[in-house]
Amino acid sequence: MQEEKELLGDLPDFSLLVLCGGKAERLSRRNKPLLPVRVNGHNRPMIDHIINACEGAIDIIISANSATEAYKSRGRVVSDPLSVSGTGGPLVGILEGLKICATHHLLVVPGDTPCLEKNWHHRLLKKAAEDGERVLVAHDNYRRQNLHCLLNLDVAPSLEAFILKGNRSARHWLETVGAIDVLYPQTDMFFNINDEADLK
């Protein structure tokens, strides 16, 4: 453990935002992140796998538009503002998370990716500490994982302006702010649960 700490150096404090606001249409609109799935021998709700993998968060924020009482036992809950019809998409949830973030860095994770390796986020934090980049995004050597990212609070005005113009594409916003990719060799880690078969 000491050797690992020395290798990583001093990592910046961060808050964790788990995105749980989707409709889960392929899962009968059940609240996906609360559904149990077995990972590494542990059968627990997806969100609990995620929180466990992202160890060290100063604050845990959950973007959710339903089942908010269930989420409150795990962290602070933010919902899409009333001015947004339906669900505003992940960018709206990210903006609401940035508004209440208790640290200078916000780690963003989708609530349906329970296979993340323990402390997977250290690579993002280390890059932020070394280079001071405002937006870092995980890349699995195949494609950019747009919603597995580390954001500096300074990007909030840019994101708000982007959303107010009616834009909702995370990929497009990341391109406009010059996001930097951080490579991960493990591609299966970012697998997201979409239907009943994935739960087994």
Report each predicted region and the residues it spans:
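Nucleotide and nucleotide-moiety/phosphate-recognizing core
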Residues: 4-167, 172-191, 196-197
